[in-house]
Amino acid sequence: MRDTAVSSTPRRRRSLRRAFTAFAAVPTALALGSGLFAAAPATAVDVTNQAQNSLFGSSDVTDYLETDGVPQRTPIRTDEHPSIQGLPSGVSVERVEWITERRIALFIRSAAMPKELIQVQVLLARDWHSNPSAKYPEVWALDGLRALDTESGWTINTNIEQFYADKNVNVILPVGGESSFYSDWQKPDNGKHYKWETFMTKELPAVLQNGYRSNGERAVFGLSMGGTAAINLAERNPDMFK
């Protein structure tokens, strides 16, 4: 019995190391594999170290993606109550702010989360204006654990806007959902009545297809919390993401 107990300890340690490696690889791959970050942010080693700290409760995987200093952005124009047909009952677009000619902020009334308007920013495809009859695929970029209600961390702290500027896809950036994992919560819900999965899978696609020329083909990735959510959403909705 003594020999068995001693010999099992290294195996347990190796199992823990393998489990941690798998855990750390997910946020690292999802956050860095897309090549969206500017030159200055942390390396993969830094992210893995922070993932290790997060595993033991000492920090957040998204600590390296600072959320302070949100830029002040003044829309170049605003469209109130745009007419979009074919939306689910209780869903409407209340306002569209044109931050630039290629970046818009949609403020959506959700039937699933009706308490407050939900903001979704869209980076429009390269040929959006020059080819107004074309429809475009989507790439969804989900935020980290400390997601702000004002703007996605992807546009605050990475070069995602510049990276996709020459690509013919609409980039979809849900705003908000701090600590939600973009899921439907039962309780407790932080006073937010989180129904993010319902919103993103049952309501948002109709807005994008009927109002913003989506062709129904989409992919999803995310940072930290958003990486977990991307995997869960794709697994639970296999016909929605490719």
Predicted regions and their residues:
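Non-catalytic cap/lid and distal C-terminal segments of serine-dependent acyl enzymes
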Residues: 2-8, 17-242
